[in-house]
């Protein structure tokens, strides 16, 4: 395979960078079985600690005493990447595995006071794939004919420390000081680092060991109970400026004079500003409805919101655009012990078709989320929760350019996602 084509194949099949686990831009669509079953909606509808600590810290004033939530999410994707270059056609599929994302949330309010506190350890996103080398494959043949084995792993955790205050019987305000931990590894790293041999073949170094990066970003929110049946809420999550991910690596060209010599690799991947707003409705004694909107500003964010496309022979990753999301969920108290929930979430696709090569990472094609779940009160102090969701396959189809930016084919990225969550809520 020519170096030009091998490079393009690599970029199309390996740039499955971090956000791939997410079902809504770079994040999961909801956190915990309650919030997830409601389609991620609830910025104006107090329910439990995980949704409050993720989307609106003002909601923790709804706690009566201590409330602790434990949750685990299981999800599995289905990546397909189809490339067409002249008469050559290829399909790449990942070694899809069930992934696990945990979450813990706590909130406390003295019923006689107005101050509430919250703390969490929340998995926001996670991704892992492993494509084996295959001598018979156009895509994954060993170097220099293909690109060999391809591996990626990304995890992001949010650690919120929240405080909220009930200003009046109707109005609560809250703030969360959020610490974010990102962990990222990719082998090889298909970015601006590479070695050339005499024939012009590119050899990319590995960044396979998980690199850790930290960010700090505050979050602000309010909740207003306009009437017994209507409430409104909103929150603002400020941008997350992670330090660049860094790896100790070596030069990869076996024929080069510096083969095996050390080099340091870096990749800058930050998080966006997010504005959420919503309406909470209680049309009946046992019925609760949440309707939310969310704006995620990816444009200009390092790593995610760059220009995209081929620039000076290097593909800029992602090139995502700003995204609007609509969420809605319904909760029905069926019996004294049983609650059922259903939800829907629609998110615009952050990928731009004109630079789809840059945005390769099929999970970003997710748009429609169908969700449902239930809760059961086992004891006065304990509720068990479960939910499921399905995101049908969506496609992003765009040009397949060469390193000079000339279109030589097409690229079709698609994915689907299936998930299930279980959890427990303790109140005491």
Label every PLM stretch briefly.
Residues 1-9:
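Bacterial N-terminal signal peptides that target proteins for export
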Residues 9, 50, 311-313:
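Generic secretory/membrane-interface signal
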Residues 9-18:
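Bacterial N-terminal signal peptides
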Residues 16-17, 62, 230:
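Charged, amphipathic alpha-helical interaction segments
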Residues 19-23:
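Sec/Tat signal peptide C-region and signal peptidase I cleavage site
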Residues 24-39, 43, 86, 99-428:
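Outer-membrane beta-barrel porins/channels
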Residues 46-55, 60-132:
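Outer-membrane beta-barrel translocator/receptor signature
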């Amino acid at each position: 395979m020519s170096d030009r084509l091998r490079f393009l194949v690599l970029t199309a099949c390996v740039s499955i960078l971090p956000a791939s686990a997410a079902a809504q831009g770079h994040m999961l669509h909801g956190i915990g079985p309650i919030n997830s079953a409601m389609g991620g909606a609830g910025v104006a509808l107090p329910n439990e600690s995980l949704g409050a600590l993720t989307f609106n810290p003002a909601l923790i004033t709804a706690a009566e005493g201590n409330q602790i939530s434990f949750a685990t999410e299981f999800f599995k994707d289905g990546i397909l990447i189809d490339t067409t270059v002249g008469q050559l056609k290829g399909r790449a599929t990942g070694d899809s595995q069930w992934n696990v994302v945990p979450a813990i949330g706590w909130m406390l309010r003295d019923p006689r006071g107005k101050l509430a506190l919250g703390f969490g350890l929340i998995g926001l996103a996670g991704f892992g794939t492993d494509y084996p080398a295959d001598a018979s494959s156009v895509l994954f043949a060993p170097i220099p004919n293909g690109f060999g084995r391809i591996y990626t792993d990304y995890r992001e955790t949010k650690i919120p420390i929240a405080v909220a205050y009930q200003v009046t019987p109707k109005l609560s305000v809250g703030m969360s000081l959020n610490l974010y931990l990102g962990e990222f590894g990719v082998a090889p790293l298909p970015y601006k680092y590479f070695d050339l041999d005499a024939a012009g073949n590119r050899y990319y170094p590995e960044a396979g060991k998980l690199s850790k990066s930290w960010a700090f970003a505050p979050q602000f929110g309010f909740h207003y109970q306009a009437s017994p049946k209507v409430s409104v809420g909103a929150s603002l999550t400020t941008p997350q400026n992670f330090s660049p991910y860094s790896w100790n690596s070596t030069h990869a060209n076996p024929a080069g004079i510096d083969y095996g010599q050390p080099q340091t690799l870096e990749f800058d991947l930050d998080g966006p500003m997010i504005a959420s707003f919503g309406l909470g409705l209680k049309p009946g004694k046992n019925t609760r409805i949440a309707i939310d909107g969310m704006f995620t500003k990816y444009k200009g964010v390092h790593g995610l919101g760059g220009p995209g496309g081929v620039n000076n022979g290097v593909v800029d990753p992602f090139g995502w655009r700003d995204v609007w999301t609509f969420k809605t969920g319904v909760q029905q108290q069926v019996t004294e012990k049983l609650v059922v929930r259903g939800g829907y979430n629609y998110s615009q696709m952050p990928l731009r078709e004109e630079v789809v090569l840059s945005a390769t990472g099929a999970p970003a094609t997710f748009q429609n989320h169908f969700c449902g779940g239930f809760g059961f009160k086992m004891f006065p102090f304990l509720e068990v929760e479960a939910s499921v969701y399905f995101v049908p396959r969506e496609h992003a189809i765009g040009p397949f350019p060469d390193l000079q930016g000339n279109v030589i084919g097409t690229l079709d990225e698609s994915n689907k996602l299936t998930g299930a969550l279980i959890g427990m809520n303790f109140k005491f």
